[in-house]
Amino acid sequence: MSILYSNIIGEAEKELIILHGFLGMGDNWKTLSKKWASVGFRVHLIDQRNHGRSFWSESFSYKILAEDVINYCDHHKLSEVYILGHSMGGKTTMNLAILAPQLLKAFIVADIAPKKYVPHHQQLLNGLAQLDFTLISNRSEASLRLSPFVKDEGTRMFLLRNLYWISPGKLGLRLNIEV
């Protein structure tokens, strides 16, 4: 069983898990997590599967994402946690509330509702899929190649936070966009 990657901030006894949105990662919440840590929370910035530094898998559903969080909590011996789930993380949180309500002290679901949404990220995924890292050597080049697919610069910069150096001179994405 693989355990989700996390960055843990703070040393308090109240456990707060942050679940990021689609195409994001836990570190998107780093600034706010420091504030929450300063008021008594130990904050777990989790990268959900196929995102950030967590493992990649062809299995991907909200039930599976919720089971990943249960496994994470078991591994870290966490119980009665607070959870903030944003967008995709909110859907994960709703599933977690059904699968393991005893695990939750309280939760917040942000920026999403319990309904089925029309897929609307295909243009972003197409843009990310066409990035040829044999031709791209820096973030600016990646942004330029992504711009026909993602017009908004802020959105491009958000997506390109997923760039990382696989090895010196070789970039890659911390996203499993195939799934």
Model-derived features: where do they sit?
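Alpha/beta-hydrolase fold catalytic core
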Residues: 1-17, 38-41, 78-79
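Active-site glycine-rich loops that stabilize anionic/oxyanionic intermediates
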Residues: 13, 21-24, 87
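Alpha/beta-hydrolase active-site loop signature
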Residues: 23, 48-52, 114
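Serine-hydrolase catalytic-loop signature spanning alpha/beta hydrolases and amidase-signature enzymes
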Residues: 23-31, 43
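Conserved alpha/beta-hydrolase catalytic His-Asp/Glu region
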Residues: 134-179
